[in-house]
């Protein structure tokens, strides 16, 4: 092979190595982003579950108050 062909081959190999290195760096960044996003998703799930529990508790309290009011209104009707 001629010297020029070897130089071209070396250049192409170096370009490939550089590209692979950049892609590896990008993969690492994406892995880090994935970990962060998974942690954020877990936190959001936890917050959603807390809110759902609070909403359910509020609904139960609301139903209890409605029942108490109905009972009081029933007693008032009995008095009248």
Swiss-Prot record:
The keyword Cytoplasm applies. Keywords: Cell cycle, Cell division, Coiled coil, Cytoplasm, Septation. The keyword RNA-binding does not apply. It holds the Pfam family ZapB. GO terms for biological process: division septum assembly; FtsZ-dependent cytokinesis. It is found in: Cytoplasm. GO terms for cellular component: cytoplasm. Residues 3-80 form a coiled coil. Gene3D superfamilies: 1.20.5.340. InterPro entries: Cell_div_ZapB. Belongs to the ZapB family. Homodimer. The ends of the coiled-coil dimer bind to each other, forming polymers. Interacts with FtsZ. Non-essential, abundant cell division factor that is required for proper Z-ring formation. It is recruited early to the divisome by direct interaction with FtsZ, stimulating Z-ring assembly and thereby promoting cell division earlier in the cell cycle. Its recruitment to the Z-ring requires functional FtsA or ZipA. HAMAP family: ZapB. This is Cell division protein ZapB. It comes from Vibrio parahaemolyticus serotype O3:K6 (strain RIMD 2210633). The gene is zapB.
């Amino acid at each position: 092979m001629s010297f020029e062909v070897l130089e071209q081959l070396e250049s192409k190999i170096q370009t490939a190595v550089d590209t692979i290195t950049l892609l590896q760096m990008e993969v690492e960044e994406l892995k880090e982003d994935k970990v962060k996003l998974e942690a954020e998703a877990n936190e959001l799930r936890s917050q959603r579950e807390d809110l759902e529990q609070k909403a359910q508790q509020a609904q139960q309290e609301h139903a209890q108050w409605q029942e108490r009011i109905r009972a009081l209104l029933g007693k008032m009707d009995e008095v009248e």
